[in-house]
Amino acid sequence: MSKLVLVLNCGSSSLKFAVVDAETGAEHLTGLAECLGLPEARMKWKLDGKHEAQLGAGAAHVEALSFMVETILASKPELKANLGAIGHRIVHGGEQFTQSALITDDVLKGIQDAATFAPLHNPAHLIGIEAAKVNFPGLQNVAVFDTAFHQTMPEESYLYALPYNLYKEHGIRRYGMHGTSHLFITREVANLLDKPVEEVNIINCHLGNGASVCAIKNGKSVDTSMGLTPLEGLVMGTRCGDIDPAIVFHLHDALGYSVEQINNMLTKESGLAGLTEVTSDCRFVEDNYGEKEEATRAMDVFCHRLAKYVAGYTASMEGRLDAITFTGGIGENSGPIREMVLNRLGIFGIEVDGEANLKARFGGEGTITTANSRIPAMVISTNEELVIAEDAARLAGL
């Protein structure tokens, strides 16, 4: 039986898709529909070369998925015919889902219930699931939750110091994100170190436009920087990360900002975009560090925050840390950021290998610290699509 899986990731205004062989990891098709719901809605994909097409003004997730089926897959009927399952990335599963699940009515309800914590993403996931059912009526759908990996966190890590009934009655707690990526990196480190996953102790830095750190002890998440939502934690592309909560009251009461304006500011106008007042693109920050004040300011704050988190998470390791790992678009490609962060952790006996660090980009992987470094640091390319495909194949019985 074929182990080809269609992997879908429906964002608020995007649809990322791939056809992945769950057995070999080979990607037979990859693509991205973006600007959904807007006049410039378009799709880019790779299948026997690179392609691009306009989807039509206002095209949304349903139209994008239909285009993928009726135009792209129609050009490769054998690819569509060999699909065995569909795996959906789900941003938030609340406390209900500790692992991936075959999608049933109960699972759909759980995704809907968790939408209160991910109001932009979970509703889009539900649209994608329904569209997939229509276009692929014979295939089983599997939900793979970003939050599931973090359900092993102890109470001391996931509770906020708020009235306890807010957790008991309303589920207000730390959930974390990027769990699929953190899980993949944990497995990769186990392979690299030739030890069981259950013995791996790492601090993984998933750095992209969204970013999070995860403390992983004995192969399980014990703490992570994102919280109830993806807004908490590190400085990100447009998200503020950690701030004094009273800033919200000051913005509202003293400066006259509406709740909607504050929400928009913290999620879409802060982070690197806010600090530079120019762009959320980390490449601008890196390229202009030391030359432009706004770039220098943003990079210093970004690296300081990240180094603080990494240092703090050593408290969860109980005396043994196998590695500090970097992944995600920034983590895999920004040598200067990795070096700045690791240099701030010199108290742990970490020594960066400058040459190895420079080589580890654009798909290059490996250890970026010297042989004398007490704790190794590694760059590892993440592959969330493969984890989703593997779980979908397993649960669908492929």
Curated annotation (Swiss-Prot):
The keyword tRNA-binding does not apply. Its main location: cytoplasm. Mg(2+) binds at N9, E384. Its cofactor is Mg(2+); Mn(2+). Keywords: ATP-binding, Cytoplasm, Kinase, Magnesium, Metal-binding, Nucleotide-binding, Transferase. ATP binds at K16, H206, L207, G208, N209, G210, D281, C282, R283, G329, I330, G331, E332, N333. Mg(2+). Can also accept Mn(2+). The record marks H178, R239 as: Transition state stabilizer. GO terms for molecular function: acetate kinase activity; ATP binding; magnesium ion binding. SUPFAM superfamilies: Actin-like ATPase domain (SSF53067). It catalyses: acetate + ATP = acetyl phosphate + ADP. Substrate binds at R89. Pfam families: Acetate_kinase. GO terms for biological process: acetate metabolic process; acetyl-CoA biosynthetic process. The active site is at D146. Its EC number is 2.7.2.1. CDD domains: ASKHA_NBD_AcK_PK. It is found in: Cytoplasm. It is an enzyme of class 2 (transferase). GO terms for cellular component: cytosol. Catalyzes the formation of acetyl phosphate from acetate and ATP. Can also catalyze the reverse reaction. HAMAP family: Acetate_kinase. Belongs to the acetokinase family. This is Acetate kinase. It comes from Vibrio campbellii (strain ATCC BAA-1116).
